[in-house]
């Protein structure tokens, strides 16, 4: 897994990968966003809803812990062994939003994540055990949770969007 020397490097990678990911939605028509293509496991609609769901959860875990509210990851309703149900809840949550509205929501959430990272000191960001919600048997530091919910899927899902567009004949 990719690592970062400091928060500035993490922020720059998030910005870079987010912009590349977001640009892939250019040219995807609203009436095509729910089309599934062979060899691609998500529609563009599902793709961005997944991102919205995870970035929202990441921000929610932090906000709840800061308020003294106990956090159950991934959510009180879903356990780690039922991620399919969680993903479906993401798709349902954003179903009524246009693709453009979802892009704006994701842009806002990414900005919120960047502001949050900027507010953290290096110990909180890079040392395991600094947040209860991030303290799992794997003992990941906060930066790794941020990475797997931003940079990593922005890269992977950008590739999926490119494949979707190629299969659709729009790239």
Label the model's feature ranges.
Residues 1-20:
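Extreme N-terminal tail/first-helix region
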Residues 2-5, 41, 86-100, 136-144:
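Acidic/His metal-coordination segments adjacent to aromatic residues that form catalytic metal sites
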Residues 18-29, 55-59, 63, 107-121, ...:
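Structural signal for well-ordered, non-membrane alpha-helices
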Residues 23-31, 126, 130-132:
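Short alpha-helical hairpin
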Residues 34-85, 128-171:
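Short, contiguous alpha-helical
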Residues 81-126:
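Acidic/histidine-rich alpha-helical segments that form the ligand environment
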């Amino acid at each position: 897994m990719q690592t970062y020397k400091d928060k500035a490097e993490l922020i720059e990678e998030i910005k870079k990968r987010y912009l590349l990911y977001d640009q892939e939605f250019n040219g995807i028509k609203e009436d095509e966003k729910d089309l599934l293509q062979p060899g691609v496991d998500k529609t563009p609609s599902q793709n961005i809803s997944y991102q919205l769901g995870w970035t929202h959860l990441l921000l929610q875990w932090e906000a709840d812990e800061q308020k003294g509210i106990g956090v159950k990851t991934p959510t009180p309703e879903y356990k780690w062994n039922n991620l399919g149900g969680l993903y479906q809840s993401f798709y349902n949550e954003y179903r009524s939003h246009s693709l453009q509205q979802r892009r704006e929501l994701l842009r806002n959430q990414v900005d919120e994540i960047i502001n949050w990272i900027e507010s953290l000191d290096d110990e909180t960001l890079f040392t395991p055990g600094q947040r209860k919600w991030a303290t799992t048997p794997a003992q990941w530091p906060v930066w790794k949770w941020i990475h797997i919910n931003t940079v990593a899927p922005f890269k992977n899902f950008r590739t999926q969007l490119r494949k979707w567009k190629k299969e659709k004949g729009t790239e």
